[in-house]
């Protein structure tokens, strides 16, 4: 019963009609069904009233006071569901809000839509502070609801001791009766609230009041199997001799419950002297009025039959094991209820503190899906149980046939007069008992043997079932371990992070190399195009060629991209053969995740080529070799598994590396080899491994991916796994069919042997009769000897057939196990198919996302290339501008000289050559040129050696003279160039910022996807843990159900055997009465004692079974206090059906 968990609703503790319909058959339930809500539709219910209701829900007393004062709201106004803020405060225990509403003049006697007022709700949900406030506000303490219950009835049903004390302190009526005639003491006794019963009795409640069916509190306490409550009621003056309307007293209810301690208490109370007057405790006016009402109720209900006599012998228990077990169960129930309440309060606090997150909804959906899966598994297990029952029925038929055959043999033994197994059988035979007495004694012996054998068979079946359950749980654990390889994922993630770090270091080294090479490229402007072409030639194909658009340069590397898929398949086969041959290196020597080898005709050549290429890689490319060693070490750490598992790991590793390397942006250089940096492929095409002189290119080799490869081996591996599973399932089914055919053939052979044995037994019986007839006339010792020898031979044959039947039972058990294993294999196959489908979908989704990311990365790379080319052009323009700016000081000097000359000439030619306005304009331009020249001089100082070289050129050009118009033209051109350069620089800055933002966005999306994946893994782990918990709970429930079913079957069988034994004992007694007195030997007395012991054992077993059912029934009564979910209702309904079936069997 540990799986029965009562889940309470904090909002309303009221049973639904389905729960009330599943109550035990003990009469009408003491908890009244609430009246139907009228749903009073208030016409003026508005948003302000809803705000008031929400404030009470949040226990916000200042807001409640403000709303009532400002808006003039009425707290007792009912909403469309029939509840108000005033009643909600009493139900939730919001004492401060209730005090505010009472202070504003609320009607404390108003009822809600169900007919409850605030006093009833506060007592029902156990809020003594609210009760005290309402009673101090002149609320009537004994007001009844629509079912006739007072506040004390509700407090007694809920078991709230403090609420009952408050009501008693305000002089509440202690013995009010509801419509069914139940008093608070009767309800508290039925709910087994011992402390509450003690309080009511101390306050003066009538202990012997009866309801309309004539039941007292003592009867209901006995029915609930609560010895503590019975003891308190007996100490309070309860009389055990009172009978109900059916004439049953408390001892009858105690006998039905099967509690020995209760029967002992009742017996002690019956032995004590009764009080002189039964009405001494009813002297007060209240008690007399209640007794008069009880008497009227008893007169109105006619008695149908007299009370049956109490049990003839009430057992006196030597120990209190049963009582201690019940006390322990009650304490455990209290702890569980307290824990459930604490968890619910914690959950409500968390809901109030923060709203539910989306992950919680996802987890709830996963839990619901797991519960649905659990229900499906339960249905499959029930179908297995039905098949097991059918096999057990077949076995029972075989056992019946075997018993019939053994019965024929025993009758033959009885007719001959041999009793070899019982003590004193030879003495009885020598004294020549009558045939009827011998027959009865032999039948008793056979019954004892059958009972012993059945007990042994039941123990063997229980052992088989336990072994089957252990195997099932072990297979489930192994299946879970095969489905989700988390260690593989962690190792691949570590390798992916390491490759990403290496890629980042290579990019950083490349940038540093580019910054060091910038001055070299500025040395010769005419050779820039040649250097760029040489760099492109050395670095191999471009990024577009890496993504699959093949250029003629890709064929130089030794493997065309057209043959990528075929080469990938051959690589996988080579890795598989290499792993089978060596067993140490699982995935071969992979430099990166996407590596395509040259196409070879055989697998051996592929292995040799990979070995050669690995050695060349280790010699020529240290960075790639380091990556290879890291990956090989990471794969070898996981261990060498099966070939298919290795292939899947290799594919997943390649996929992970490809996805990881596709994210970072690529610099201006491209990869040297698109199909894997291998030295052998380079030598085959005439390209030397040492021909690459650019160290920046070598640094980028391990970080550049080979484009989008979708790994066709994953689908092939999944198909192979599915085909293998289907072949295994077919093989299991074929083996099961073969076993079934063999078992059927063996059963037919056993049936034929049984028929032959029956025919032989008939012949022997006829021969025995003939021998008896001949013995009666003249008798012959030789025939008797032959008959005995034939009987011995028949016994041997029957023993052989018995052993054969046992072998058949073992074979049937093996068949059951095989069928169960087949079903488990089918379940595993279905789970694996679903898992493969999910993995395939996830892989396709990830491949689509990877394609999108790669396209985005390709566009980003193209944009980056364009920006780099634009930056190179801008750099060249900047160099030209700097060169021109370096020429400005000489031009400025010349301008100064020209200005001086112009000043001199202006004095002479002021009227004829240059006007005054033009002179002022030239002076202003000269001033601007001076400021600009000063800034340019500062830049010239920073340039260093190049400025000195340019000054030398300027010195050579100073010899030439420049005219004024030429000077103005040069100045205008320089100004336009400077403005154009500034605009280009601003545009370049904007593009750089945009590119940086896009790169940052891509990185952030990658990190977000990583965090989401980790969260999904954590959620999957929690869901798996919850699934394991649900599976264990379902297994426990199934075990409890199977134990209860076995106990019920045993009880039925024992009842039948008891009836048969009683009949046989009766016949034996009759036969013994017919015998002379001299036959009463000690052996017969010993047999009688054995018969009595067997009967007593069977009676004790029946009583134990009835006590178990009564214990389940008491737990059902305890669960009435809370809301039961569907699982608990189903389990309790099964228990009730078992009890009804037992009653029908009796």
Swiss-Prot record:
GO terms for molecular function: actin binding. SMART domains: ANK. GO terms for cellular component: plasma membrane; stereocilium. Residues 272-320, 607-627, 766-785 are annotated as: Disordered. Transmembrane segments: none annotated. It is found in: Cell membrane; Cell projection, Stereocilium. ANK repeats lie at residues 81-110, 114-143, 147-176, 180-209, 213-242. Keywords: ANK repeat, Cell membrane, Cell projection, Coiled coil, Membrane, Repeat. The keyword Cell membrane applies. Residues 320-517, 714-1110 form a coiled coil. GO terms for biological process: auditory receptor cell stereocilium organization; sensory perception of sound. It holds the Pfam family Ank_2. Component of the stereocilia rootlet in hair cells of inner ear. Bridges the apical plasma membrane with the lower rootlet and maintains normal distribution of TRIOBP, thereby reinforcing stereocilia insertion points and organizing rootlets for hearing with long-term resilience. Homodimer. Interacts (via C-terminal domain) with TRIOBP (via C-terminal domain) isoform 4; recruits TRIOBP isoform 4 to stereocilia rootlets. This is Ankyrin repeat domain-containing protein 24. It comes from Homo sapiens.
């Amino acid at each position: 019963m540990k799986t029965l968990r009562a889940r309470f609703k904090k909002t309303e503790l009221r049973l639904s009609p389905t729960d009330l319909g599943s109550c035990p058959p003990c009469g009408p339930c003491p908890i009244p069904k609430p009246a139907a809500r009228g749903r009073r539709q208030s016409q003026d219910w508005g948003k302000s009233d809803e705000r008031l209701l929400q404030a009470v829900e949040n226990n916000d007393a200042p807001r409640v006071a403000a709303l009532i004062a400002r808006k003039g709201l009425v707290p007792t106004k009912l909403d469309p569901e029939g509840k108000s803020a005033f009643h909600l405060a009493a139900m939730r225990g919001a004492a401060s809000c209730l005090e505010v509403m009472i202070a504003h003049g609320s009607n404390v006697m108003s009822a809600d839509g169900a007919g409850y007022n605030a006093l009833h709700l506060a007592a029902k949900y156990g809020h003594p502070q609210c009760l005290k406030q309402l009673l101090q506000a002149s609320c009537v303490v004994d007001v009844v609801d629509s079912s006739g219950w007072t506040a004390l009835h509700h407090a007694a049903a809920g078991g709230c001791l403090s609420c009952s004390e408050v009501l008693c302190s305000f002089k509440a009526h202690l013995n009010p009766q509801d419509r069914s005639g139940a008093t608070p003491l009767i309800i508290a006794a039925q709910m087994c609230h011992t402390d509450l019963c003690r309080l009511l009795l101390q306050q003066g409640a009538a202990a012997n009041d009866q309801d309309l069916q004539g039941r007292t509190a003592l009867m209901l306490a006995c029915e609930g199997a609560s010895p503590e409550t019975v003891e308190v009621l007996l100490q309070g003056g309860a009389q055990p001799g009172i009978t109900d309307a059916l004439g049953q007293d408390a001892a009858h209810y105690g006998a039905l419950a099967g509690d020995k301690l209760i029967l002992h208490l009742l017996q002690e109370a019956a032995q004590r002297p009764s009080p002189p007057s039964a009405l001494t405790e009813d002297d007060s006016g209240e008690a007399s009025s209640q007794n008069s009402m009880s008497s009227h109720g008893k007169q109105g209900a006619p008695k149908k039959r007299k009370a049956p006599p109490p049990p003839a012998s009430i057992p006196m228990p030597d120990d209190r094991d049963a009582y201690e077990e019940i006390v322990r169960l009650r304490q455990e129930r209290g702890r569980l209820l307290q824990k459930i309440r604490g968890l619910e309060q914690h959950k409500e606090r968390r809901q109030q503190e923060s709203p539910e997150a989306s992950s919680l909804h996802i987890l709830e959906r996963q839990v619901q899906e797991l519960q649905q899966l659990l229900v499906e598994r339960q249905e499959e297990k029930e179908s297995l149980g039905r098949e097991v029952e059918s096999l057990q029925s077949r076995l029972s038929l075989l056992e019946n046939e075997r018993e019939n055959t053994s019965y024929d043999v025993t009758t033959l033994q009885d007719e001959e007069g041999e009793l070899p197994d019982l003590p004193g059988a030879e003495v009885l035979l020598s004294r020549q008992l009558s045939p009827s007495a011998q027959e009865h004694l032999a039948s008793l012996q056979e019954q004892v043997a059958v009972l012993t054998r059945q007990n042994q068979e039941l123990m063997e079946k229980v052992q088989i079932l336990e072994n089957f359950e252990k195997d099932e749980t072990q297979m489930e654990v192994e299946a879970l371990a095969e489905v989700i390889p988390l260690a593989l994922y962690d190792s691949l993630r570590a390798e992916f992070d390491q490759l990403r770090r290496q890629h980042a270091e290579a990019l950083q080294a490349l940038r540093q190399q580019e910054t060091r090479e910038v001055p070299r490229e500025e040395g010769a402007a005419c050779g820039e195009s040649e250097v760029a072409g040489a760099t492109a030639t050395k670095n191999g194909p471009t990024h577009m060629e890496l993504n699959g658009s093949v250029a003629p340069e890709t064929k130089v590397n030794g493997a065309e991209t057209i043959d990528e898929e075929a080469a990938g398949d051959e690589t996988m086969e080579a890795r598989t053969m290499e792993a089978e041959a060596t067993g140490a290196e699982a995935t071969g020597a992979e430099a990166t995740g996407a590596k395509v080898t040259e196409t070879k005709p055989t697998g051996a050549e592929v292995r040799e080529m990979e070995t050669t290429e690995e050695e060349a890689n280790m010699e020529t490319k240290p960075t790639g070799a380091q990556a290879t060693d890291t990956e090989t070490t990471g794969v070898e750490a996981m261990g060498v598994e099966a070939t298919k598992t290795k292939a899947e790991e290799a594919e997943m590793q390649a996929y992970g590396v490809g996805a990881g390397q596709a994210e970072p942006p690529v610099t201006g250089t491209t990869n040297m080899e698109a199909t894997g940096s291998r030295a052998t492929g380079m030598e085959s095409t005439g390209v030397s491994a040492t021909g690459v002189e650019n160290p920046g290119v070598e640094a980028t080799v391990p970080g550049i991916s080979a484009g989008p490869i979708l790994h066709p081996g994953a689908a092939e591996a999944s198909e192979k796994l599915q085909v293998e599973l289907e072949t295994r399932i077919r093989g299991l089914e074929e083996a099961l069919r073969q076993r079934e055919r063999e078992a059927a053939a063996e059963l037919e052979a056993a049936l034929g042997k049984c028929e032959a044995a029956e025919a032989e037994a008939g012949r022997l019986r006829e021969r025995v009769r003939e021998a008896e007839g001949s013995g009666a006339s003249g008798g012959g010792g030789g025939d008797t000897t032959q008959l005995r020898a034939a009987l011995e031979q028949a016994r041997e044959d029957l023993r052989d057939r018995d052993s054969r039947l046992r072998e058949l039972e073992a074979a049937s058990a093996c068949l059951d196990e095989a069928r169960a294993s087949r079903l488990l294999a089918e379940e595993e196959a279905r789970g694996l198919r679903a898992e493969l489908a999910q993995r395939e979908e996830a892989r396709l989704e990830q491949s689509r996302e990877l394609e999108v990311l790669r396209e985005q990365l390709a566009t980003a790379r193209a944009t980056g290339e364009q920006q780099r080319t634009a930056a190179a052009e801008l750099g060249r323009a900047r160099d030209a501008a700097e060169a021109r700016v370096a020429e400005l000081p000489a031009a400025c000097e010349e301008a100064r000289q020209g200005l001086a000359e112009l000043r001199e000439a202006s004095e002479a030619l002021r009227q004829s050559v240059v006007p005054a306005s033009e002179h002022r304009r030239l002076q202003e331009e000269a001033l601007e040129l001076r400021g600009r020249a000063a800034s340019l001089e500062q830049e010239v100082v920073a340039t260093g050696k190049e400025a000195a070289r340019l000054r030398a050129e300027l010195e050579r050009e100073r010899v030439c003279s420049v005219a004024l118009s030429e000077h103005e033209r040069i100045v205008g051109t320089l100004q336009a160039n400077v403005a154009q350069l500034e605009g280009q620089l601003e545009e370049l800055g904007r593009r750089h910022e945009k590119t940086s933002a896009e790169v940052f966005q891509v990185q952030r999306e990658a990190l977000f996807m990583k965090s989401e994946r980790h969260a999904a893994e954590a959620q999957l782990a929690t869901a798996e843990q919850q699934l394991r918990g649900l599976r264990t709970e379902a297994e426990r429930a199934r075990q409890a159900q199977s134990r209860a079913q076995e106990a019920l079957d045993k009880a039925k069988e024992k009842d039948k055997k008891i009836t048969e034994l009683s009949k046989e004992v009766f016949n034996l007694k009759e036969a013994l009465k017919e015998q002379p007195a001299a036959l009463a030997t000690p052996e017969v007395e010993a047999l009688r004692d054995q018969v009595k012991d067997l009967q007593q054992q069977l009676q004790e077993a029946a009583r134990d079974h009835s006590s178990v059912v009564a214990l389940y029934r008491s737990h059902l009564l305890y669960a009435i206090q809370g809301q039961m979910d569907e699982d608990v209702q189903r389990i309790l309904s099964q228990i009730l059906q078992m009890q009804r079936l037992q009653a029908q069997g009796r």
